[in-house]
Every structure is written in C-alpha cells, then in structure tokens.
Curated annotation (Swiss-Prot):
Binding site for NAD(+): 36, 55-56, 63, 127, 157-159, 228
Family from the record: Belongs to the THI4 family.
Function: Involved in the biosynthesis of the thiazole moiety of thiamine. Catalyzes the conversion of NAD and glycine to adenosine diphosphate 5-(2-hydroxyethyl)-4-methylthiazole-2-carboxylate (ADT), an adenylated thiazole intermediate, using free sulfide as a source of sulfur.
Catalytic activity: hydrogen sulfide + glycine + NAD(+) = ADP-5-ethyl-4-methylthiazole-2-carboxylate + nicotinamide + 3 H2O + H(+)
UniProt cross-references to SUPFAM superfamilies, sorted A to Z: FAD/NAD(P)-binding domain (SSF51905)
Complexes and interactors: Homooctamer; tetramer of dimers.
Top-level enzyme category: transferase
Protein name stated in the entry: Thiamine thiazole synthase
GO molecular function per UniProt: iron ion binding; pentosyltransferase activity
Gene: thi4
Binding site for glycine: 238
Lineage of origin: Bacteria, Pseudomonadati, Thermodesulfobacteriota, Desulfovibrionia, Desulfovibrionales
Cofactor(s) it depends on: Fe(2+)
Transmembrane segments: none
Pathway terms, separated by semicolons: Cofactor biosynthesis; thiamine diphosphate biosynthesis
Amino acid sequence: MSLDERIITQAILETYFEKFKSSLDLDVAIVGGGPSGMTAARLLAADGFNVALFERKLSLGGGMWGGGMTFNMIVVQEESVHLLTDVGVPVKRYKDNYFTADAVAATTTLASAACLAGAKIFNCMSVEDVMLREENGVKRVTGIVINSSPVEIAGLHVDPVVLGSKYLVEATGHAVEVLQTLVRKNDVRLNTPSGGIEGEQSMWADTAEINTVKNTREIFPGLYVAGMAANASYGSYRMGPIFGGMLLSGEKVAADIAAKLKG
C-alpha cells in the first residue's frame, strides 16, 4: 500500500490535539522534565490521575544526561535505588550507600516509564505564567499559561493559551522559573521564612540531598516545589551529580498530591 503524506499529517494533527484537548483540565501539571518531574509524572499517572509534563527543551532529562562534567554516569544513594530499578534501570553498587547507573540509560528509561504509565509529555512547550483565582481573599494557582518554545526563543509577539490544573508542580531546577514569575507579578507571600524565594546556596551534597526531600512541599496554594527547585526556594544547597534526592523528591510530591486528590 502506498503512503499518502496528507494522511501522515492528518494522523499527527488529530492524535496530538486529542492529547492536547484531554489536558485542558488536568489533575496535575508538572513544569520541568528532570528526574524529579519525570518520577512524579510516572507515579501520579500510574495512580490514575490526569497528568501532563511540560518541558521547554526538545528532550527530557534536565541535568541527568551528562552525569558529572559530561562523564555520563550518575550516583544515587541506597534509599533511592528502587526508583531506578522499579523501571528497569541497571544499578551497580560502588560502595556502601553509593550506587551508580548509566546516565543515558537512566534518563531515557525514566522518560519512557512516565509515558508508558500514562503521563502526557509536551516537549518544546514553555510555561510562561500561571493562572490564579481568589476566594475569600486567598489566591490559588489553578492552571498554567503556555506557549511554544520556538515562539519564546524567537521573541515573537504571540499570545499564549491556558490549561487548568488542580495542582501544579514547579520542577524547573535551579532557576525556579514558575515561582519567579508568580512572585514578580503578584502581591503574594510564599510558604517560606521570608515569604519570598530564599535562593540556592553552594555545594554541600549530604545536606542538600536531605533537604531536597524535606523542602518538597506546597509552597503556595495549589503549587508544589520539587527537585532542585525545592532547595532553591527554601535556601538550601546544591548537590551536584548525585540524583537520589531528586528521585525521592518526585516520589514525595506525587504521594502528597495523590493524598490530597483522593481527599
């Protein structure tokens, strides 16, 4: 049977917009496709929730691809190993509490597992703002404002569109881009000591890994922080090419949001 290029185009258009239309009212929107975002997306989707992940770049993975300084191996600690092995990533013990995995295998498998669990992935999609509603004087995040990344990169004056979500996960890493926009544009106070973004400190892997999980929480009504964004929001340290805290943060934010959605 000969191929018709028009049908190829039609297939892409119809199936993509079916996926897009099913994301108009999400249970959870996740911004950022690093290890914490991918883990959260997989677990929430596997739990039956309507979940979509938005990644500005063409590929998912955040900083995981390059390991340390482009030496593409990563390290995780023992308590997080299950979040790799559960999806089929081979892990090797290096020393007590130090396990290694191939960075490319880990990244691609985490991304695939999220998709296969039912999470919808929108790459090349930038989240430029949030949607807010106010009830009884309390503001709450109720959705995301999105645009095509090429539009953003080219600096074109093109209006975005909006998707609703019951909860939003800020997992954009060091830059905390969603929170930066929320704070800059609105008279709001975050659930932090100062009421603002505390800022990331320098390298201290042990404390950073502990705090990545500890700081994973609802920082503003309807908005959670996870991964490195959690530490940047609450003023903790960076950790470098050890990824256990990121994975555990994704697991924690998924569990916390699932508990709220189940009511």
